[in-house]
Regions:
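Extracytoplasmic thiol/disulfide redox context detector
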Residues: 2-159, 227, 231-244, 276-277
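Cysteine-centric redox/oxidoreductase cores and disulfide-bonded domains
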Residues: 153-250, 254-277
Length: 277
């Protein structure tokens, strides 16, 4: 701002007194060279004044006269960034989709042509909401499957459920899906459990094991697999992909060639599926 004002002052002074910079001649009539130089000085002064006025007026124009233009510019930049992000995600999913599914639990028809990848956390309320929307979609479509990428970001509230469903997938894929639905629709810790952080992880795991037993899983084998390499590999894959795709929170959905951060309704999921190849 200071430099802009200084340039404006210089431009005004140059316009008013620029003639004093011209070389003096003995003739009363100005020479052709002085006339040209005078016009050049005036032109430079006008450019400096016009540029400075524009720079000083632009913030006022953007914020007071036409504030919507700023929002339009921001929205345009965000749309452009999202389009580029979607392009990178699409390219990766097309080449590495099978690898992304290798150790992950799957809901719906495992052989379906259309795939939804969802980064989710069992203790995230928005993830629970979008899970319900996904269940509504799957109930009406046999051409869609949902690949669960367990992005454990809430520590002891998330670790045991995430590991359990991945480990359950090694035992029985259908029961793994059933356990996923159960963990998303029922509480596996209480407000009382939260009062003692030192025992919270153990209490959460104990409750998860009760649910696993309820769906018919071998809980001894489940505990062993939860600490095995396959589970560790899948959790690494989830974190690595989150970093690659710049996923900072849950839920996050990839549907066809589009990415959706946050919980979205069933009709929006349906629309994205209809647009997907």
């Amino acid at each position: 701002m200071t430099w802009t004002i200084l340039i404006l002052v210089v431009g005004i002074l140059l316009f008013l007194f620029g003639g004093m910079l011209l070389p003096k001649t003995d003739n009363k009539k100005p020479s052709a060279g002085n006339i040209v130089m005078g016009k050049c000085i005036n032109l430079i002064a006008i450019i400096l004044i016009a540029g400075s006025v524009c720079r000083l007026y632009m913030p006022y124009y953007l914020t007071a006269v036409n504030p919507l233009i700023v929002q339009e510019m921001v929205n345009g930049m965000q749309e452009q960034q999202q389009a580029e992000k979607n392009k990178q995600i699409r390219k990766y999913v097309r080449s590495e989709g099978k690898q992304m599914m290798r150790d992950a639990p799957v809901l719906g028809n495992r052989d379906a042509k259309k795939t939804i990848y969802v980064w989710t956390d069992f203790s995230c309320p928005y993830c629970r909401r979008v899970h319900g929307e996904l269940e509504r979609v799957l109930a009406d479509r046999d051409d869609t499957r949902v690949v669960i990428k367990n992005f454990s970001i809430h520590g002891p509230l998330s670790d045991a459920p995430a590991k359990a469903v991945i480990a359950a997938n090694l035992q029985d894929k259908e029961k793994a899906a059933e356990l996923t639905n159960m963990l998303m629709t029922r509480e596996f810790y209480s407000s009382k459990d939260l009062q003692d952080q030192s025992t919270l992880a153990d209490k959460v795991e104990a409750n998860v094991m009760k649910m696993a037993k309820e769906v018919g899983l071998d809980t001894d084998k489940l505990k062993e697999d939860m600490n095995g390499e396959v589970v560790a590999r899948e959790l690494r894959n989830v974190r690595d992909l989150a970093q690659r795709f710049e996923i900072s929170g849950t839920p996050f959905l990839i549907i066809g060639e589009q990415a959706f951060p946050g919980a979205i309704p069933a009709d929006q999921i349906e629309s994205a599926l209809d647009e997907a190849e």
